[in-house]
Regions:
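An N-terminal assembly and electron-transfer interface module characteristic of large anaerobic redox
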Residues: 1-109
Length: 109
């Protein structure tokens, strides 16, 4: 999962929690915690899995409406997704709904 330097890294053995990431976070402050695949590509271009800067570019070009901040990052490896489905997923969905978000972009690792 993608997180900001200073935040607690994701548990690479499986983590159903999430991290809030402000859209204006500098690229050099983003980190990746994952051991189930080669993260070199993510280190080179974090937008390949968390398209926050690309979304801001689309917003600036007028192709999408206002981008929501913060964005939410989840771990890609969750062997038991029950807590994600029953607790953290609905929690984030509720926050997005409260903020009036019309659509989401989901990236995978």
């Amino acid at each position: 999962g993608i997180y900001v330097a200073g935040q607690e890294p994701f548990d690479t053995d499986g983590d159903w929690s999430y991290r809030e990431i402000p859209l204006d976070t500098p690229l050099d402050q983003l980190r990746v915690a994952h051991t189930r695949y080669d993260t070199i590509g993510v280190a080179e271009d974090v937008d390949s899995v968390l398209a926050m800067h690309r979304l801001l570019e689309l917003e600036a070009e007028g192709l999408v409406g206002e981008a929501q901040t913060p964005t939410y990052s989840f771990m890609g490896y969750i062997p038991d997704p029950s807590v994600l489905m029953e607790v953290t997923g609905p929690e984030v969905a509720g926050r997005l709904k409260e903020d009036g978000v019309d659509g989401v972009v989901i990236g995978t690792t």
